[in-house]
């Protein structure tokens, strides 16, 4: 039986490789390199474990695209997956019901690793002359309360997200100063090795929050002083501006903080991108928008007609997080108390958003920035005051020190 299964697996792999070569999509050398990076590294997972890690709903979405492009029958692939797993709430590691593997870890803390960005402004860095390169990527493990430095020497890092599919982290650096046009975007393995520059220094102004679209292998990020919403592939190719709220060569635009784009979230299934424009500090002029991911024919990033204003008059909205399953949008706000320095949410399930339905989930943060929703529907929040919180039934401090935290990534 084992030999029979091996023969079927190997035959399927060979058929797909030969098809790729016949269509001149890749080369033998590139295919072998991809195979080694996907399945033969010490951190690599076998295929079924990898699908559970990625999420079976994401696997189904990727397969839907492939079936549509190739005119294939999905009965024994994605249809079977949805009927036997997804529709039963079995999404993989992120689900309490498991996935292809039915065993679910009992300890929440043991399966949770929190990736944190130390922007370099805190008292943990005694030499303020080194701030421009004092940024770090840290990994915090709640079960052991241990902190590991993965990457150092970064220039004001701000946004980070994890690709479960590629087992890599992606992050933004604002640059040596927020006033200089020298921002950049990078990626690395989850242990901090194999650092790659995705968007080189100077190609963007001040990149802020970044999110990963694993299904399409895209990253999205906002450029604050650059006044835009950006998209590119995992390797930095096909870099596009989706939304442009002002022009750098117009001083009146650059100085208008209501044009500054900061937080971002993406919904691949519905085809939306969400973003915040925070406004001046503590000014109550913050807004949240959304638009289609694809620009309509005949339009540009600067004159899009499909941009929806969802919320306005917010204290100072910063980063976003979308619960795609339940269609709930979360955001941090670093505005003035009592409604600022808060964690908030609103339903975006319908075509029309009801502003009066927004909720404040927790208050009294110290300049909150990054946030991530975990598999228990708890929100991990990090703030510039040096604390990391878990917000569920209540608000709990899970880490406190003299670091200024910005972005948050999560591996479960």
Named regions from a protein language model:
Residues 108-112, 123-126, 132, 154-167, ...:
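Beta-rich, blade/repeat-based domains predominating
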Residues 1-108:
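NAD(P)-dependent Rossmann-like dehydrogenase/reductase catalytic/cofactor-binding core
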């Amino acid at each position: 039986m084992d030999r029979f299964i091996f023969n079927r697996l190997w035959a399927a792999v060979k058929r797909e490789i030969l098809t790729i070569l016949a269509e001149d999509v890749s080369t033998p050398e590139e295919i072998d390199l991809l195979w080694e990076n996907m399945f033969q590294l010490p951190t690599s997972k076998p295929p079924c474990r990898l699908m559970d890690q990625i999420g079976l709903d994401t696997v189904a979405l990727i397969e839907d695209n492939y079936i549509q492009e190739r005119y294939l029958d999905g009965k024994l692939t994605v249809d079977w997956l949805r009927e036997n797993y997804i529709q039963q709430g079995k999404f993989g590691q992120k689900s309490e019901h498991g996935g292809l593997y039915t065993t679910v870890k009992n300890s929440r803390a043991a399966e949770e690793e929190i990736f944190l960005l130390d922007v370099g402004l805190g008292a943990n860095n005694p030499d303020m002359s080194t701030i421009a390169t004092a940024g770090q990527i840290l990994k915090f493990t709640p079960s052991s309360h241990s902190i590991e430095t993965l990457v150092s020497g970064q220039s004001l890092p701000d946004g980070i997200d994890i690709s479960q599919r590629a087992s890599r982290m992606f992050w933004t650096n604002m640059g040596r100063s927020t006033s200089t046009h020298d921002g950049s975007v990078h990626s690395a393995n989850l242990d901090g090795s194999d650092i790659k520059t995705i968007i080189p220094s100077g190609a963007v102004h001040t990149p802020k929050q970044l999110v990963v679209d694993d299904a399409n292998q895209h990253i999205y990020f906002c450029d604050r002083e650059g006044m835009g919403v950006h998209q590119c592939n995992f390797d930095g190719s096909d870099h596009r501006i989706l939304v442009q709220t002002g022009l750098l060569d117009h001083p009146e635009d650059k100085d208008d903080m209501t044009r500054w784009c900061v937080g971002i979230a993406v919904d691949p299934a519905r085809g939306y991108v969400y973003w915040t424009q925070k406004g001046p500090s503590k000014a109550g002029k913050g807004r949240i928008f959304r638009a289609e991911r694809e620009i309509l024919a005949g339009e540009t990033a600067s004159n899009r007609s499909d941009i929806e204003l969802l919320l306005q008059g917010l204290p100072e909205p910063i980063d976003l997080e979308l619960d795609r399953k339940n269609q709930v949008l979360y955001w941090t706000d670093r505005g003035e108390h009592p409604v600022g320095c808060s964690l908030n949410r609103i339903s975006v399930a319908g075509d029309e958003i009801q502003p009066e339905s927004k909720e404040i989930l927790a208050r009294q943060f110290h300049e909150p920035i990054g946030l991530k929703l975990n598999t228990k529907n708890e929100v991990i929040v990090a703030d510039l005051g040096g604390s990391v919180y878990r917000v569920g039934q209540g608000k709990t401090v899970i880490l406190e020190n003299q670091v200024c935290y910005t972005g948050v990534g999560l591996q479960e």
